[in-house]
Amino acid sequence: MLIILAPSKKQTYPNCPNLVSTCPEFLQEAGQLNQILRAKTEKEIALLMKTSKILTENTLRDIRAFNGSEGRGFPAIFTFKGDAYDGIKAEDWNQEQMFYAQQHLRILSGLYGILRPLDLMQKHRLEMGLKLATHSGTQMYQFWGEKITDTINRQLDKGERCLINLSSTEYSRVIQKKKLDGRMIDIIFRQIKDGRARTIPIYAKRARGAMANFMVQEKIRDSEKLKNFSSEGYRFLPGESSEDSWVFSCTLNKK
C-alpha cells in the first residue's frame, strides 16, 4: 500500500533530525527540467508560472542555485510546509514510524516526479499542471505520467496493492489509472458549515495531512482501517462512499 500527497509551494530549509537521507529516484530528470527552466527569461518564467515580480525573482534564484548532484538539499518531509504539512508531525515519529513512512508515503512533485519522505530535495517552484515543453510533449503530465505510474506499480508489490490518494486533482491526474496495477482509493473530505456539506479547500488540505500522519503513526497496512480516522471530528460516511471513493465529513465549529 502507498499513500500519495501533493507537494506544497511553501518550502523552507529546516533544522532536521539526524537521519539517514536518500536520493530521489528521478534526480537526473529533475536536472533536465531545471535546465529547461534555466534557459528561460524572467518574463517567460513569470508568464509560465503566473507569478508576481518578487515570486519570479525568488523562483529564478532557486533555478540558478539548483545542483543536480547527489547529497544536495534537505529531506522532503521536513522541507514542505503549508496547510497539509501542518498536520504531519514527522518530528514526532519514532524510528519504526519513519521507516513505515519511507516505505509507504510518497509526495508527488513537478520537479522530482515522486519523493520519499527522506529524499533530499532543493527549493523549487514547478507545478504539475503547467504546460512546459519537453522532449515528451507540451505538458508535465506527458513527461511524468509513465515514469511515476511505473514507479508506483513497482513499489505496490509489498502488501496490499492499494494506492491511497490524499493528493490534489492537479497532481493525482499524473497517474495513468489504466496502467495502474492496483486499486486507487480517492479520499474526499467534506465540511458541514451552516447546515451545508461541501469541500472547503483549506480544511481538506489539513485533513489530508492529518490522515497521512494517522496512517504513519498507526503504521496502517490494511486500507479498511483508514475508516477509523477521527481526527478533528471527521467520520467515515459509508452511505456517501463508493468502493474507490471514500467520503469523510466533519462539522465546523461556529466562531
Curated annotation (Swiss-Prot):
Annotated GO CC locations: cytosol
Biological process terms in GO annotation: response to hydroperoxide
A Pfam family: H2O2_YaaD
Entry-linked InterPro entries: YaaA (IPR005583)
Family: Belongs to the UPF0246 family.
Name listed for the protein in its UniProt record: UPF0246 protein DP0358
Origin species: Desulfotalea psychrophila (strain LSv54 / DSM 12343)
Top-level taxonomy: Bacteria, Pseudomonadati, Thermodesulfobacteriota, Desulfobulbia, Desulfobulbales
